[in-house]
Amino acid sequence: MSPMNVDAIRDFCLAFPGATEKLQWGDDLCFKIGGKIFAMAGLDNPRLCFKCTPETFAELIEREDIHPAPYVGRYKWVMLDRLDAVRWDELQELIRVSYEMVAAKAPRKKFRKKGSASKRTRLKRKRA
């Protein structure tokens, strides 16, 4: 059984390392990594946007209730008009890929946990 609701999506997105949330543009709950959005869920309107690969984008927009996301569709973001437009297990995989794609381009120091030393700092400590 799939939990297909904003709370389940929120829990899933915030489980990723360094993921944060911020309410933006009225009722959009944005999930971010390093200050960059990897998924957006509507609180008042059950919709979801996320980034995907060009191949997945082409396949998804052929489905009912899925289309290029407004303003960012040209960057291969899709919008699901209904949270149940895809199966829960498929949605989890799509969000995971979005997170990984955005995290790969996000500045590392923005999502490094406080208190964790950089590689350079650890090397200096070993030599001292």
Positions of PLM-derived features:
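Charge-dense, helix-prone N-terminal extensions
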Residues: 1-128
